[in-house]
Amino acid sequence: MTHQTHAYHMVNPSPWPLTGALSALLMTSGLAMWFHFNSTILLMIGLTTNTLTMYQWWRDVIRESTFQGHHTPTVQKGLRYGMILFIISEVLFFTGFFWAFYHSSLAPTPELGGCWPPTGIHPLNPLEVPLLNTSVLLASGVSITWAHHSLMEGNRYPMLQALFITIALGVYFTLLQASEYYEAPFTISDGIYGSTFFVATGFHGLHVIIGSTFLIVCFFRQLKFHFTSNHHFGFEAAAWYWHFVDVVWLFLYVSIYWWGS
């Protein structure tokens, strides 16, 4: 690195992409084992290896950016493009779920009773827990923006306060969603309605958990003075991701909970 004459970061060989791929294989295989054979051993191994991989990979990235100074403006620009492309890929991912929902609901087949929701399905009231969930996520969108502006202005404690509120709202949303699933009068196996409802809202819930984890990492980094007003892409990426999760929920609420009921 002493003879480097360019602004790019030549990453050292790392085992984490390999362990990450292995943990993803174990998790997906474990999920299938859990569904079909009611065994959670493989799933737990996958979750454990995935958690360890995330911790150590994040640790290495923090070392490279904060302590070794490898994240030059050029590198940060590349990371920004990468995050934008990742969010675009997530948009297309959710587009598939919305497509399945509208394909099924706009022209219900005779097997569904020719109506939507299908005969025998009692949908959730969109003005109860789903509306509260919407309020919680919109409030978290406001608080993450407050945290971002506080960081850009160099106000450390308001930033920590706003970030903590955002994390708390994210956890609250997850608990509300879990209670809604527990009390829902239909299951994932109740035809196309149950499938589209639980897959779309379930993947969104997974993204909320991922986003909350991302924000928790940012919270602890801010406690250790890792972010400055002009060098904080880790937090910025987390904020972008959180806003994406917010917008997806608004589409889910309007489509599946409100119009679909």
Swiss-Prot record:
The keyword Cell division does not apply. It is found in: Mitochondrion inner membrane. Residues 35-40, 106-128, 184-190, 257-261 are mitochondrial intermembrane. It catalyses: 4 Fe(II)-[cytochrome c] + O2 + 8 H(+)(in) = 4 Fe(III)-[cytochrome c] + 2 H2O + 4 H(+)(out). The chain crosses the membrane at residues 16-34, 41-66, 73-105, 129-152, 156-183, 191-223, 233-256. Belongs to the cytochrome c oxidase subunit 3 family. Component of the cytochrome c oxidase, the last enzyme in the mitochondrial electron transport chain which drives oxidative phosphorylation. The respiratory chain contains 3 multisubunit complexes succinate dehydrogenase (complex II, CII), ubiquinol-cytochrome c oxidoreductase (cytochrome b-c1 complex, complex III, CIII) and cytochrome c oxidase (complex IV, CIV), that cooperate to transfer electrons derived from NADH and succinate to molecular oxygen, creating an electrochemical gradient over the inner membrane that drives transmembrane transport and the ATP synthase. This is Cytochrome c oxidase subunit 3.
